[in-house]
Amino acid sequence: MLDVNNFEYMKIGLASPDKIRSWSHGEVKKPETINYRTLKPERDGLFCERIFGPMKDWECSCGKYKRVRYKGVVCDRCGVEVTKSKVRRERMGHIELAAPVSHIWYFKGIPSRMGLVMDMSPRALEEIIYFASYVVTEPGDTPLEKKQLLSEREYRVYREKYGKGFSAGMGAEAIKKILSDIDLEKETNDLKEELKSAQGQRRTRAIRRLEVMEAFRNSGNNPSWMVLDVLPVIPPEIRPMVQLEGGRFATSDLNDLYRRVINRNNRLKRLLDLGAPNIIVQNEKRMLQEAVDALIDNGRRGRPVTGPGNRPLKSLSHMLKGKQGRFRQNLLGKRVDYSGRSVIVVGPNLKMYQCGLPKEMALELFKPFVMKELVGRGLAHNIKSAKRKIERMSPEIWDVLEEVIREHPVLLNRAPTLHRLGIQAFEPTLVEGRAIRLHPLVCTAYNADFDGDQMAVHVPLSAEAQAEARILMLAAQNILNPKDGKPVVTPSQDMVLGNYYLTLERENAVGEGTIFKDINEAQLAYQNGYVHLHSRIAVFAGSIPNERFTDEQRNQLLITTVGKLIFNTILPKSFPYINEPTKFNLEIETPSKYFVDTTTDVRAHIAAQELIDPFKKKILGNIIAEVFKKFHITETSKMLDRMKDLGFKISTKAGMTVGIADILTLEEKHEILEKAHDTVEKITKSFRRGLITDDERYERVIAVWNAAKDEIQGKLILSLDRLNPIFMMQDSGARGNISNFTQLAGMRGLMADPSGRIVELPITSNFREGLTVLEYFISTHGARKGLTDTALKTADSGYLTRRLVDVAQDVIIREDDCGTDRGLTIKAIREGTEIIEPLEERLEGRYSRKTIRHPETKEVIARENDLITEAIATQIVEAGIEEVTIRSAFTCNTKHGVCKKCYGKNLATGTEVEVGEAVGIIAAQSIGEPGTQLTMRTFHTGGVAGDDITQGLPRIQEIFEARNPKGQAIITEVGGEVVSIEEGRDRQQEITIQGTDDRRSYNIPYTARLRVEEGTIVERGEALTEGSVDPKALIRVRDVLSVQEYLLAEVQKVYRMQGVEIGDKHVEVMVRQMLRKIRVMDTGDTNILPGTLMDIHTFTEANREAILSGSQPATGRPVLLGITKASLETDSFLSAASFQETTRVLTDAAIKGKRDELLGLKENVILGKLVPAGTGIGRYRKLKSEVIKETAEVTDEITNI
């Protein structure tokens, strides 16, 4: 058997008839399957034991030889070899066809490969193959031409006229004859000659033919093998037949299809033996051809063959295609043992790295480990009795189970796994009941809630797997989100509310202004009711265990609240004491205004101070990020647990509730509405008098109601009590937002109708008063639209992620430094005057390409190839530098991946990226995962003269698929000055641009909004009108880098507009994959075919060789491919076939005799090899063996002692 981890490549090609026979273990001659009386396979039938192997292990068909001792014996009575029944999954058979049959993939695919080789149209081929016309195979001395089509009548006429002077035939036989006569060398040379002069359609056809000819020539495939003489029969276990209750059988469709082929083949043999008339034989041959077509690809030609209930039968091609096909169902997504799933419930008392595993589940998952331990401890004599003990649930197994699961991490996964944080490792603790307990802080990463979600558990078995799970995947390690490097484990809901309540300040609370000597005294006073959590008090600063206070401050009093004293106990001692939610306090120190001398009148001082805001969700996130930066993983995860516990505790103590009394009504609401009604009335009057158009009226009415709603909202906020539970919930960021509150207590406002147009009748009621019937009806549109939109969006976003993963799955960090001398110059991304992504954020975690100096002092801020940290990035921006050249994935020279320097920092860990990191997949997940948060609709920019601007998910798809954008901007092909803008015919505008040596004019439709005016200086490729630039047009007038920069900025605009932050490097990795190919224009003296799409690296390599040998290099132009197209154009046919268009990819690969070098992840997963990323990459695999050798020696020594 082949060792799965030990082969280098996989090759695919056409099989010759001899090859098919050499695979086969015998010919299938009968269409029978199983004898229905004995339930044994029929001899020479589709399940024959003599051909395919025995049904039962080590037992021949007739029962003469049983038991393993006869291994390898071939029974003399029934001819079955005594072996394992598993061989029925791998032994193939064959059918000797009575007449050659064409393979539908090569004849019917687009373009028809057979047609290109023979230089015939697919239409003509079809007539020949299905016996409608004759084709001349040998014209002899007659005036007929080779490959000329003859109808039945013409054939008879010529036969009478020339007798046997020529030969013509029908069906696949004739095709085979023509194919075997083709001289590939001669044809190739002729085509190359033709290319030198041919133009237009002829040239295109010649190039396509040349491509196929070269493929056949180079791969060693013979064109005549596209016609089958022998048909392989796949192993019976792969097309099984199973008995259902009631004695009926269920069988795979393939058996029906094979049966049809065998029946027709046998009938044809009989007809030929009988010497039947030609017309009957021809009809039977046609039927055989159709049967084989249906078997290979049912439904590709004509009506599909149907089974019971008019259901088309699934052919061999269908077995590979689609989500249920072999590739995606069984090779890329396998079900695994040692796994289980159950409902999740919250485990608030768990540590960050723990999860609760139900006892029954743990016992089943760790069964083998428990059995081994039971035998090891002598509690069971052998494995069998250990198993019995477990099944009986003997009491002693629980102690053993506890021991076994200690420090054995398990993986928890929640579907849909949108990013790598969808699978994390935890240490299991046993819990009663049947639900998995999940730590509340990891819910954000999993996007889990406890309304019935389920999660799956997997057990890593080997020592290496456990080590990887513990070191790389433990939940306590996954604090940062890979997409932007911000903490993903921020407290939510109750935890936020608790910490918000804890850090609130209240005027004149109980015991305000009391002075305490230390925290304990303050807490004691709080517990006895002398002070409140919210009371502002003074504490002797020296008693607080904080290392950041200065000596002077230690001798002073610190003005704070009891709640803040408690809150600060969860932070590390060397972290600033947090007294106010400001950046200064977080990053530098506690502001000195909170320290007063011991002689101060504390009460008067406090009374004069403003109240400080409590700590909201965002601040808690910033605290976590700061702690992570300064103290790293372990300390942060401990601090998070303390924050969680404190939040829950205080939240419980505060006893927040929501009642109808908390929803206050607004006195002024009636007035505001009256005023609005009056204004609307005036607007309507103006419209009736014809002073404004209907559109203007509509826009103004909507503006009036929006203003009214905003006014009510503003007044509501002012009238709210800061301690109102609903206000606290939304202000802290625990749940809800201000618009929810406005709808409860103010007015609901305007709603959209099903088409998305805003209904101008506002809903003036709120939920506390209740809606009228009409208002309720108007509201239902919006509610339904929301739900349907979400459902559609999820599917779209998932498909986008799938395409992104596919195009970038082989991008891995391959080396430390690629040594490139190019870089990417970056500045802040802007939309008009608004900054979308500041320079600071773009710089952090990247390597500088050139030395960066301060523009005035000339002092070096960062050297060439230095990592730009947050501090350096701030320095650069403060020095007033606006653009910086950095190393980027765009300019990286690494083949099949990126190097460490061009990629920069790994956002998920905050440290340098490791060689072997699968950055392509991380990039795809980072862009795809927030996809569900993007909006679906195409926005209408208000006003009459507005183009539709696509935003949200559709815009992201438009960019990555490189489609022509909606609302396309007109770009200039020359750089220079706009000399005139004139109005032309049909109210069009004509813009004229004077370049240095060229003058161009552009006609602009009158609906477009201009971005330039007379005298503006424009560069080549700059947009003249508002809208999106078509990147394909941009690549024609500018260089690749400009297109890459443009795409990067556009993607960032969409995500940032929706408030989603994504690291630039992820977008860079994806965009780079779209621009990997080059289209060859002139081949020079190389042996590349013109018009070929090839990888830039391969192209450069071929040119280097040409230049070194002194010949003419090829020229090409870079091509921008959409992600779907780029995935299908990858060098790996396994990866492409498992993505989309399976049959087309495989047909192409087989003709070219392609080799899959197994560089990406997908192809290795398909073959069951270790993926070449992470610890599976070459350099780490070599390490392993050496380490193992050492440990082996050590163990020997131990045993000797």
From Swiss-Prot:
Pfam families (alphabetical): RNA_pol_Rpb1_1, RNA_pol_Rpb1_2, RNA_pol_Rpb1_3, RNA_pol_Rpb1_4, RNA_pol_Rpb1_5
Main enzyme class: transferase
E.C. no: 2.7.7.6
GO cellular component terms given for this protein: DNA-directed RNA polymerase complex
Signal peptide boundaries: none
Top-level taxon: Bacteria
Keywords for this protein: DNA-directed RNA polymerase, Magnesium, Metal-binding, Nucleotidyltransferase, Transcription, Transferase, Zinc
Residues the entry annotates as binding Mg(2+): 449, 451, 453
Gene Ontology terms: biological process: DNA-templated transcription
Residues annotated as binding Zn(2+) 2: 818, 892, 899, 902
Keyword Transferase: yes
Catalytic reactions on record: RNA(n) + a ribonucleoside 5'-triphosphate = RNA(n+1) + diphosphate
Textual note on the cofactor: Binds 1 Mg(2+) ion per subunit. Binds 2 Zn(2+) ions per subunit.
GO MF annotations, alphabetized: DNA binding; DNA-directed RNA polymerase activity; magnesium ion binding; zinc ion binding
Cofactor(s), names only, from the UniProt record: Mg(2+); Zn(2+)
Positions annotated to bind Zn(2+) 1: 60, 62, 75, 78
Assembly information from the UniProt record: The RNAP catalytic core consists of 2 alpha, 1 beta, 1 beta' and 1 omega subunit. When a sigma factor is associated with the core the holoenzyme is formed, which can initiate transcription.
Protein function: DNA-dependent RNA polymerase catalyzes the transcription of DNA into RNA using the four ribonucleoside triphosphates as substrates.
Record family assignment: Belongs to the RNA polymerase beta' chain family.
Name of the protein: DNA-directed RNA polymerase subunit beta'
Source organism per UniProt: Listeria welshimeri serovar 6b (strain ATCC 35897 / DSM 20650 / CCUG 15529 / CIP 8149 / NCTC 11857 / SLCC 5334 / V8)
